[in-house]
C-alpha cells in the first residue's frame, strides 16, 4: 500500500519476480476493504506512512482491529523514518506490533531481506 505509483509498480514487479503473490493498492481505504474480505489469505502488509486518505498508522490500527492476535506481519515504510515516526510514534508502533520500519528509498534487497525475516 503506497500512494506513489512508481513505488507500488517497482515493489510489485520485484516481489513477483522472486516468487511472492502480491495485491497492490494506491488507496488505503480500498486496501483495508480488501484486507477485511481476504483476511485469511493475507500474511504480510507493507504500507507507507504518509498517504492522503488515511495515514499508514491509521491503516495499521484498522488492520489490528481485525487482527487481534497480531498474526499478520506489518512493514511500515516512510521517507521520514529517522524523524517524527521513530520519535513521536515509537510507543504506538510498538503497541500495534509493527514488525519492521524501513526508510525510503530502500534497496529491493533490503525489502526482500525484511520480508524473508518475517515470513519463513
Feature names for model-found ranges:
Residues 2, 48:
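Active-site residues of response regulator receiver
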Residues 5-23, 96:
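Two-component/phosphorelay signaling modules centered on CheY-like receiver
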Residues 77-79:
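Hydrophobic/aromatic residues positioned on beta-strands within the core alpha/beta folds
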Residues 33, 57-70:
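Short amphipathic alpha-helix used as the core "switch/output" element in two-component signaling
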Residues 24-44:
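Acidic, metal-coordinating helix/loop segments flanking the phosphotransfer/catalytic sites
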Amino acid at each position: 500500500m503506497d500512494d506513489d505509483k512508481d513505488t507500488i509498480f517497482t515493489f510489485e514487479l520485484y516481489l513477483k519476480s522472486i516468487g511472492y503473490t502480491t495485491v497492490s493498492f494506491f488507496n488505503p481505504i480500498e486496501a483495508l476493504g480488501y484486507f477485511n474480505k481476504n483476511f485469511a489469505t493475507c500474511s504480510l502488509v507493507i504500507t507507507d506512512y504518509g498517504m492522503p486518505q488515511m495515514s499508514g498508522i491509521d491503516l495499521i490500527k484498522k488492520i489490528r482491529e481485525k487482527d487481534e492476535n497480531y498474526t499478520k506481519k506489518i512493514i511500515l515504510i516512510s521517507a521520514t523514518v529517522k524523524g517524527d515516526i521513530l520519535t513521536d510514534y515509537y510507543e504506538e508502533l510498538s503497541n500495534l506490533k509493527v514488525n519492521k520500519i524501513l526508510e525510503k528509498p530502500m534497496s529491493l534487497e533490503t525489502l526482500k531481506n525484511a520480508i524473508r525475516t518475517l515470513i519463513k
